[in-house]
Every structure is written in structure tokens, then in C-alpha cells.
């Protein structure tokens, strides 16, 4: 009798634990359908830093694309779904946040060398990299080119990104009530020597590929009383 009770208790505990673990999965499975772009609220959107990444790739000796990232960056987006071409985006990047996963940390701090070296990002003298859009051109139902000014190392040059609208919610799942969410992917290529960053060219490539994955969320939408 005692053994049967113990087995029942163990099974009950396992079932209860499984139910708890399944709850987030069930909630995700019941996420609402994405909204049409025209249904999303107009206004200012801020970057969801938990769900955003900024990586870049550069050729190393023509053998591989060396990949690194910035972990400290921010962006804001102004959007009017009825006039997507009027969208504007601004971004700031902290060059001190560059990460390369350099494997020999005991040998040298390569991330710090890239961030602060006068021949690299020289963050002590130029602590911020900025991007400000100047034009958005639609290229498809969910795609556009975003042209803007990239300022780095005290030099400002135009850059064009190819952006894809991944989708949006008028009520972003797991967000506070009234918060909309949208997502974009974007890629672009710059010639680093245009900003005076020409160290080791051409052994280390001049062309740098930029890859952005971003989610933005709106401020809570205030519901007007009937």
C-alpha cells in the first residue's frame, strides 16, 4: 500500500512539472496571427535590445569571412504604415562593445585593441558610430532600401541597406497591453577605407558586410473611451 502511494505521488509530481513546463510552449503556440502592415500603429518605435543583433564580416586572406559583432547599440524608428517611404531610422553604436571571440585572451585583449587602437575604431577619440536615414524606397511588398549617413571616425558617408519587413503585431505577445511590435532584417556592404579604416587592406578585406536583425516595439497605445 505504501509503495503504491509513493508511485502515485511521484507520477503526480511528474505530471504537474510537465504541465508547468508546457505552459510557455502552449502560450507560444497560441500567439495571435501577425497584423497586416497597414494595421500597425503609426508613431515612434524603440529597439528591443533583447531581440536584436549587429554583426559584420570581412574577408581574411581570401580564405574565410572573419565575423564579429557590436553588443551595445540602439535605434529608434518612426513609422507611418500608410506611407512607408516616409519612415525614418536613427542608430548609435558603441565601438567599445566590439566582440570577436578571440580565442587567446591570455595573449592579448584583441577586442580592446580593435576598439581603441588608433588604426582601428579609435573609440577613445571617436566614442560613437551613428547612422541616420535620409531616404526609404520600397522595392517589394515587404522589402525596401534604406539610404542614410554613416558617421564613423569623424567621417560621414552615405550607406544603403537592403531591408526586409518580417512581420508585426498590433499587440506584441508577452509585451504589456497596447504595445505593438515589428521586426526587420537588413544587410549592406561598406568600403571601410572610405572612413579611413584601411589597416591591412587588402590582406584583410576592404569590403565589410553588415547584418542586422531587429525587433522594435511601440509605446503603449492609449485606448480612447467610447
Mark where each language-model region is.
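Hydrophobic alpha-helical transmembrane segments of integral membrane proteins
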Residues: 20-21
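N-terminal signal peptide c-region/cleavage motif recognized by signal peptidases
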Residues: 24-26
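Bacterial N-terminal signal peptides that target proteins for export
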Residues: 4-17
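Low-complexity, acidic/polar, glycine-enriched regions of mature
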Residues: 29-226
